[in-house]
Amino acid sequence: MSTVEPNAYDPQQVETSAQQFWDATRAFQVDENSDKPKFYCLSMLPYPSGALHMGHVRNYTISDVVSRYKRMTGHNVLQPMGWDAFGLPAENAAIKNKTAPAKWTYANIEHMRAQLKSLGYAIDWSREFATCTPDYYVHEQRMFTRLMRKGLAYRRNAVVNWDPIDQTVLANEQVIDGRGWRSGALVEKREIPQWFLRITDYAQELLDGLDQLDGWPDSVKTMQRNWIGRSEGLEIQFDVRDTTGAALDPLRVFTTRPDTLMGVTFVSIAAEHPLAQHAAKSNPELASMLETLKHGGVSEAELETQEKRGMATGLTAVHPISGEEVPVWVANFVLMGYGTGAVMAVPGHDQRDFEFANKYGLPIVQVVKLREPRNDDEQAWDATQWRDWYTDKSRELELINSAEFDGLDYHGAFEALAERFERKGQGQRRINYRLRDWGVSRQRYWGCPIPVIYCAKCGAVPVPEDQLPVVLPENVEFAGTGSPIKTDPTWRQTTCPECGGPAERETDTFDTFMESSWYVARYTSPNARDMVDRRANYWMPADLYVGGIEHAILHLMYFRFYHKLMRDARLVDSDEPVTNLLTQGMVIAETFYRDADNGGKDWINPADVEIQRDERGRVVGASLIADGQPVHIGGTEKMSKSKNNGVDPQAMVAKYGADTVRLFSMFAAPPEQSLEWNEAGVDGMARFMRRLWVQVHKHVGEGIDDELTKIVALGGPLSAEQKAIRRKTHETIGKVDDDYGRRHSFNTAIAAVMELSNALAKFDDASAQGRAVRQEALEAMVLLLNPITPHASHALWQVLGRGETLLENVPFPQVDAAALVRDALTLAIQVNGKLRGTIEVAADAAREQIEALALAEPNAAKFLDGLSVRKIIIVPGKIVNIVAG
């Protein structure tokens, strides 16, 4: 029996002891040789930034709770962990700290692994890997060479953000107000060769597959559907003429609104379009404009918000119906990477075209009207004022100013135009996707080398598989003004594997989404010689994936796509990588600041602030602890370095213990909602942990023996109070089981256990039967909390006389249906549907007895005075409704 004093809950001692037991017994290592049903649960792997933040803690605690619960319900559970270790932050840190990215990364992994272990997660560490190691990325290099041979990987020119000072490509998020984040130089749009994967070949399958993902949030599936962006329309040919009237290569444009074709008053093309380049040769002013348009970012979001700019090229396009010539303009909101790089401009019914036409004085024509306008605003049409109905095709529309197509609705016009263009060879029906092929080239150093060799004679040649991996040199000096491998001739220069002549290696590296697109499968067989082995089909698809909704599009789309590539390579059997997805909310915290001399804000960490709150816990005042002077209250925002409102998990674990931190992170909010960090709430969880500790030790102090655990089942009749505690215990078991297993509602599970604890605190029956009832309740509480507070549960199980064991191997408590049966029921009494009182009846009371008691209930009788009872409706166990008149 434990010798720990009742008031001596020492989280550090308890947690160290439990973790040592788990490590010594290799408690969470699993294999495939089990007759239990498998359950594969994981969180999105972390980037080794150097320290965990509270978002990590919440994420990994959610998956750990589910993993431990599933072990207790008889599953063979895999919960692995690894490191998404390539990427830009390591390069930035290398510049700042004057160290190699590899050294910085590996040091961070060591530190963060220790942090994760301190939180007691049930992780199979034997499967750990870092994606920056050659024995990991060799497999994606091999896959890439196979995709090259199948035509699913290809190279073409693409527009990127180019920093002319640092001589490097910038990610969209590194372009701030059109300038490089580090150099401050005006960013240029530059066209360079890049490698792509043909995700568009899988667009329809990716779209259709969403219908099978019943365990994914609808919000994520909607975002993916919108990103794939399937649309049906027409591809229409516009003949093009130069200033002399000579014919040039025709333009082909795709439109989902062929009904607005007669409203085309100009055609827009991208600055990089061959026709724009052709026109600029004889037009210096246009050439200057094209040079200007090279500056600024290339992200879709930036294009949507930037000022519309453009210039006439001098070229004209021939309208395919009217034969009229309309001008061809260069416009900065048209990109070569989207569609054909050309757009038919209908300013009367497209807002971007409308804004552009008004700016440059181009004609605007109405060609569609609403058949049933709801108000005067919808009846009027104004070429100077945009209204949303101009582009609304969800309403009943009618074509006007459209020659022989007048009077047709959208569908009629679509069919008529499609038939005409297909008959004349001027166009065709097409299904188009917003989704674009995945550009996987990055002009950065710290990434997986792309396994391609360039030969003057043979062109781009995949590195032979027996020469893989192409290893990234790690011991480099990194200054940030270019990639070390680009300037290292001993690494770059090689021999062509086909002709034996001199050749050079590709110096671009893979987009880091490549590594995170297949790691879930690698966990299943981390030591396999190929990408995965047969063990993958035992574990895949994963049963639960936990991560932020911010990954809904890019990571989760590439993740699904790459899994299909692996399936088609016969590496896995499943169509999708994950069956169920849980997207946890952000961790938010209060912010405080003082006005800075430069007009900005100096953000102050909440730990450095003395906070005054009202009776509802709202912040009503704040001052800096250091000087006692007031600080501004900035509101509640996502924890971030920029707002300096982060909380160090390590400090919280040191102060309160891992179990308390885990408990608060699960109790403060449902998983899908934002969690507001509140240390007063953490204090509350710490008090509950101490109270539970005392409850168990006080009970044990009264003495326990082997027979005590059997008395409930074997003993005589229970008193009403004993029955009430047993009923509460088993009601709690049923609720927590449902909250963990079906609803993932961990906060309500904790609340239910707290209610049981409160009820037990009022139960002071010292009889053998009473102590047996208490023993059963305490054992249930310890087991119910084990997924969330595993260290304390490990210790308290021993205190309760059950010995030291892995609680995940102890079956999750089961509801005893007999314990839920009530001797008496409380029924609500309604008179004509309104609540008038309650009555207590025996659980097996006859209908006649219930009716008599209901009619005699004093308050109900008062409202029945002078009325005749027409009907009595009894809802068993709940309500008696007396209908009178």
UniProtKB/Swiss-Prot annotation:
Where is motif 'HIGH' region found? 46-56
Under the heading InterPro entries, the entry gives: aa-tRNA-synth_I_CS, aa-tRNA-synth_Ia, Leu-tRNA-ligase, Leu_tRNA-synth_edit, M/V/L/I-tRNA-synth_anticd-bd, Methionyl/Leucyl_tRNA_Synth, Rossmann-like_a/b/a_fold, tRNAsynth_Ia_anticodon-bd
Q: Quote the catalytic activity from the record.
A: tRNA(Leu) + L-leucine + ATP = L-leucyl-tRNA(Leu) + AMP + diphosphate
Q: Which GO terms describe its biological process?
A: leucyl-tRNA aminoacylation
Residues crossing the lipid bilayer are none
Which molecular function term from Gene Ontology is one that the record holds? leucine-tRNA ligase activity
> Which protein family is it in?
Belongs to the class-I aminoacyl-tRNA synthetase family.
Name of the protein described by the UniProt record: Leucine--tRNA ligase
